[in-house]
């Protein structure tokens, strides 16, 4: 698998969960002899919602909610076969979305 790159994008609502998962991936890749670039923090997406509290009157009474989506990027350069096997066996938290692309 020479001259290849594995790009891993992680998304999560909890920043502690995503940091722990990136640390696990980086340690696993380095332990198997691959070169790692990252984790690179990508911009956090903030979604804000405003909801009326009262169903009839009191238009001024509103609640505001926010969801933050944290993202990280990890590049693994020149992965070995051991690296791919170890990453496949790696068990990550349930709240982390993982996208893997080969390039």
Swiss-Prot record:
Organism: Blochmanniella floridana
Gene3D superfamilies referenced in this protein's UniProt entry, alphabetically: Ribosomal protein S10 domain
UniProt-listed HAMAP family: Ribosomal_uS10
InterPro entries to which the protein is assigned, alphabetical: Ribosomal_uS10, Ribosomal_uS10_CS, Ribosomal_uS10_dom, Ribosomal_uS10_dom_sf
Subunit architecture: Part of the 30S ribosomal subunit.
Superkingdom as given in the UniProt entry: Bacteria
PANTHER family (UniProt xref): 30S RIBOSOMAL PROTEIN S10 FAMILY MEMBER
Record's function text: Involved in the binding of tRNA to the ribosomes.
A GO cellular component annotation in the UniProt record: ribonucleoprotein complex
Listed SUPFAM superfamilies: Ribosomal protein S10
Biological processes annotated in GO: translation
Keyword Ribonucleoprotein attributed: yes
Keyword tags: Ribonucleoprotein, Ribosomal protein
Lineage: Bacteria, Pseudomonadati, Pseudomonadota, Gammaproteobacteria, Enterobacterales
GO molecular function: structural constituent of ribosome; tRNA binding
Record-stated family: Belongs to the universal ribosomal protein uS10 family.
Pfam family, one: Ribosomal_S10
Name used for this protein in its record: Small ribosomal subunit protein uS10
